[in-house]
């Protein structure tokens, strides 16, 4: 019978793969249409109602694209709506949140040293932060502040900074970054689902019926689309950050997250300006570089823990196991030279993925990962540099599978 932990790990991999694929589709189409829209040109003799056009070449063929702000003379029977890329990305992302962070809440979501809570409370708090994030954003956009694009963006940035700070006081550093990305991605996808597509459908229905559409729908959709454009790169950074503990494992992780949003805006501003043929603002790259150097410096400030590391409730069974003393000796001797608060292995300056196995709490909390990486597979240590034996691997398997029995 297949081990459940192995099945769950493959499920996590499959959902992550799906999320990456759908994300590529969404981001690709989004970037393409932003560049296309900004690059449209007008010329004499264009069809009635055409706002602009663009000639493109790709894959050995030529494409002639025209944009209409109102219905063309003959409304096509079929329209391609670009929406499922967004929906599928959010759904697969939420599925991954459930598979990794909710199913493994005691390890990946909750840090007893930050805020002790039960797994159900942590999960409810997670869902609440994601939902409240969208509600606050939407209310701000619909408020009088929404009439000023610049003013709205500045206020939204301050809100994101506050959320980043708050999340680091609720969850693990890794989960805080992931949730900031999830809140931002939810805002982006909800913009498509609840604003952009519905508004576009209203406009299309009016055009088909021969009515003059209200320009406010297009203006609102364009504002939300602009927000999505500028939020894309920070979301990608936040989603990738769980592989780089230097980003989330520092005392100033919330400051790093806040600076990443500015970097993303600077980079997108450069490409938007170039695609619009309105100049070549190289200064944006200099600004992004300076901010990234500041991020590197901030990442060197470790997160200070007060008191002894606390063991999560679900990990107590692994410490109580009769195998634990031998397992501890094995892990300390074979793994902790890298996976420690202060690694001693040459070339390793920070614990890979932030996983520290130099305490009883760290070993017990990461029992499942030790079992999969060093017990059931030979993925760890890399190239077996610490020469862990088959007998020791069998011990790790027996410890995990026998815990609580």
Label each PLM-derived region with a short phrase.
Residues 1-12:
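Short, strongly hydrophobic alpha-helical membrane anchors
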Residues 16-46, 183-199:
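Hydrophobic alpha-helical membrane-embedded segments
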Residues 30-73:
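Membrane-interface amphipathic/juxtamembrane segments adjacent to transmembrane helices
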Residues 69-94, 200, 215-234:
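Loop-to-transmembrane boundary segments
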Residues 74, 81, 101, 281-284, ...:
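Aromatic- and Gly/Pro-enriched helix-to-coil junctions and flexible linker segments
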Residues 81, 86-105, 164-178, 231-250:
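Alpha-helical transmembrane segments and their membrane-interface junctions
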Residues 103-217:
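Long, contiguous internal "core" modules enriched in hydrophobic/ aromatic residues
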Residues 146-154, 249-253, 275-289:
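Membrane-interfacial entry segments at the cytosolic side of transmembrane helices
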